[in-house]
Design a protein with these regions (language model features):
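Conserved beta-hairpin
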Residues: 2-23, 38-41
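Short hydrophobic/aromatic beta-strand element in the GNAT-like acyltransferase core
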Residues: 2-6, 22, 59, 64, ...
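Conserved acyl-donor/pantetheine-binding loop and adjacent beta-alpha core of acyl/acetyltransferases
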Residues: 24-64
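Conserved GNAT acetyl-CoA-binding A-motif
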Residues: 58-62, 88-101
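Conserved beta-strand-loop-alpha-helix junction that forms the acyl-donor binding cleft
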Residues: 63-72, 97-107
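Conserved acetyl-CoA-binding loop-helix of GNAT-fold acetyltransferases
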Residues: 64-67, 72-87, 112
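Conserved active-site alpha-helix within GNAT-family acetyltransferase domains
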Residues: 78, 101-120
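C-terminal "cap" of GNAT-fold acetyltransferases
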Residues: 123-142
Length: 142
C-alpha cells in the first residue's frame, strides 16, 4: 500500500507539466526488499511515538523525497508532504522515516518545516541515522 506522490508545475499556457518533486511512501512490506527497512522494523517494538506503540500495522515508511533545486524554499516540500499525508492518513496513524545524521539540511527540513520527532538513533552498515516519526492526523500546512 502506498505510492509515488508527484509535484508538478504547469506551463503558463497549460500545455505541459514539469515534475518538480516527488515523495515515496509505502508499507513496510513493500520496503522489505531493501535491507535497512527490516532492520528498522525490528527496532520499532522498542520505540513509541507520543505515547503510542509503533507497529508494522499502524505505521508506514516515508521517503525518499526530492524537490528540484530551483523550487526549494518555495513551499513545494510541505505541500508535497501534505499531499502524501492525505493519501496515507486513512490507513496509517503514524509515519516513520530515517535521515542520515550527516545530512543537516534534511534533518532541518523534516524536524523544523514538518515537525517530525526523532524517536531513534542507529547505525546501519557503518552509517549513522536518525529515525523519525510523525502524526498523520496533523497537517503540516498550519
Amino acid at each position: 500500500y502506498g505510492g509515488v506522490f508527484v509535484a508538478v508545475e504547469t506551463s503558463a499556457d497549460d500545455q505541459s507539466e514539469t515534475v518538480i518533486g516527488y515523495a515515496l511512501a509505502a508499507s513496510w512490506a513493500y520496503f522489505a526488499q531493501w535491507p535497512i527497512f527490516p532492520f528498522m522494523l525490528a527496532r520499532l517494538s522498542a520505540l513509541d511515538f507520543e505515547g503510542r506503540a509503533i507497529t508494522e500495522a499502524n505505521s508506514f515508511q516515508y521517503g525518499p523525497v526530492c524537490v528540484d533545486a530551483a523550487y526549494r524554499g518555495l513551499g513545494v516540500f510541505p505541500r508535497l508532504f501534505e499531499t502524501m499525508r492525505l493519501g496515507m492518513c486513512e490507513r496509517y496513524p503514524i509515519g516513520v522515516t530515517f535521515i542520515n545524521r550527516l545530512n543537516p539540511h534534511s534533518y532541518h527540513a523534516h524536524t523544523k518545516k514538518l515537525g517530525m520527532t526523532v524517536i531513534d538513533e542507529f547505525e546501519f552498515k557503518g552509517r549513522p541515522y536518525y529515525g523519525l516519526a510523525f502524526d498523520m492526523a496533523r497537517s503540516v500546512l498550519g
